[in-house]
Amino acid sequence: MCSNYDAVTNAERLRLYFDVDVPAGIKSQIWPLYEAPFTRRHPNKDVGDEAVPAREAMAGRFGLIPHWAGELSFGRRTYNARSETVAEKPSFRDAWKHARHCIVPAEWIYEPDWRTGKAVPTRIQRKDGKPMGIAGLWGSNRKATGEEVFSFTMLTINADDHDLFKNFHKPQDEKRMVVILREDQYDDWLGAPVGLSPDFMRQYPARLLIDAADPERGSKTRTNPTPNN
């Protein structure tokens, strides 16, 4: 399960790989409830105006905050959504039902490697140097603050048999990985109806990824965002 990653904040890389502009005020190191960019299909794409782009980047809290949640802190436990149960869980089922698909641009993600007997923060990224496009769901909430707050979650799948992700988390735990999309899937995912959503829940090949231990990541001080509620 991914609770920490580095967002794509470089304007040129966001434009080149995701065809969107970077939202203002975004930091690179992301933890639950931090604001980070996510990409969604432009809501006015189908109005017939060719000037409307296919995608837009939004700033949202990492951790889906459903419309009925009364506190932003709800997102501390909803930063990942299991693809096997996403249609049933109250936190996610509305976003899944209405196919509120998004892509989370990430330079790399972090997972704990327990093979030495203790957790070693490990950076995982694409071998070709391109950023990851992680499949997610987005939502909006007005109840918590009275103002519209956007948020998102990353979708995950089983990785017990994945040559790379099977190495992470405690030995007795189920192995999970985020759903990393190919570039040629981006628009298909953003526009897919709910009936086709499961087709995208596939493992990204281990041969196209690299990992490296980053022990300092675990010792770095981070400032937790303070939710308004």
Which residue ranges define each predicted feature?
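Short linear sequence motif anchored by a di-proline
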Residues: 1-229
